Design a protein with these regions (language model features):
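Long, internal low-complexity/basic segments
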Residues: 164-244
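C-terminal cap/loop subdomain of S1 sulfatases and analogous C-terminal strand-loop tails that border
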Residues: 28-34, 76-79, 84-154, 159, ...
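Histidine-centered active-site microenvironments of extracellular/periplasmic hydrolases
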Residues: 10-70, 74
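Active-site rim elements
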Residues: 40-42, 62-72, 85-91, 160-167
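Extended amphipathic secondary-structure runs
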Residues: 1-14, 22-23, 79-81, 241-244
Length: 244
């Protein structure tokens, strides 16, 4: 905040403040204990993938100062929005949507019905965020003890402490339908296929690949440190999710 303020003050001194668009965002969040991940981003969950987006654009956001937009968007939608505002052409292959309407009216209903999130670096997961729900489907645990399905009520449980998958199998089924719909609309036409499935076929994330020497070393360490149950599950399921 301190250094941003210095930039803003300099813009004002140079009489550029009213001619400069300010956009603040990020690439990902950091879990602080959620899903037993500390100070890192290892899952396709809400905390990791909900990023800030603060926009001040003279002539666009003037009538909407200090407001919050609750609609759902991808980061890639920002590029499409900037293109629209600046009257730049957008390639037909771009998947982003324009959300300029939300910048002028925070009550706009112009948003995505749901968001699908993929993670293939520290685990192999695909999730879907809709309404107040988050469903996470785990394909490779990345040496953790994630179950196959995790369902969270983000409004009541923002830190993802209570997995409701067993209590709401109808919502799990609906979430998987949305994920399948997204895969059909996006991955079937991808030039190089589904990258998440590529990681799974190769044996899982690099640090937890079942074909690497690290795999057995880690499992042996678990056995030597009173975590034999977890070691047995990893040997049995080869990194795939298992029931607790």
């Amino acid at each position: 905040d301190f250094y941003l303020n210095k930039v803003f003050e300099d813009l004002k001194k140079m009489n550029l403040w009213d001619d400069t668009a300010i956009i603040i965002s990020a690439d990902h969040g950091e879990n602080q204990g959620e899903l037993n991940v500390w100070g890192d981003h290892q899952t396709a969950d809400h905390i990791t993938n909900r990023v800030p987006l603060i926009i001040r654009w003279p002539g666009i956001t003037d009538t909407n100062k200090g407001s919050t937009v609750e609609n759902k968007f991808y980061n890639l939608d920002l590029t499409s929005t900037i293109s629209q505002i600046t009257s730049s052409s957008q390639p037909d292959r771009w998947d982003g949507i324009n959300f300029t309407e939300n910048l002028t009216n925070s009550k706009s209903s112009n948003g995505r019905d749901y968001l699908v999130i993929s993670h293939g670096a520290w685990s192999c997961q695909r999730s879907v965020r809709w309404d107040k729900w988050l469903l996470i489907r785990t394909y490779d645990t990345g040496l953790k003890d994630f179950p196959k399905y995790m369902l969270f009520d983000i409004e009541k449980d923002p830190h993802e402490l209570n997995n409701l998958a067993d209590q709401h199998k109808d919502l799990v089924a609906h979430g998987m339908y949305l994920i399948d719909e997204w895969i059909e609309e996006n991955m079937y036409e991808a030039d190089r296929g589904d990258p998440l499935q590529g990681v799974i076929r190769e044996g899982g994330p690099h640090h937890a690949n079942i074909y690497s020497k690290v795999w057995n070393t880690y499992v042996e360490r678990l056995e030597k440190t009173d975590r034999k149950k977890h070691a047995d599950n990893l040997r049995k399921y080869k990194g795939k999710p298992f029931s607790k």
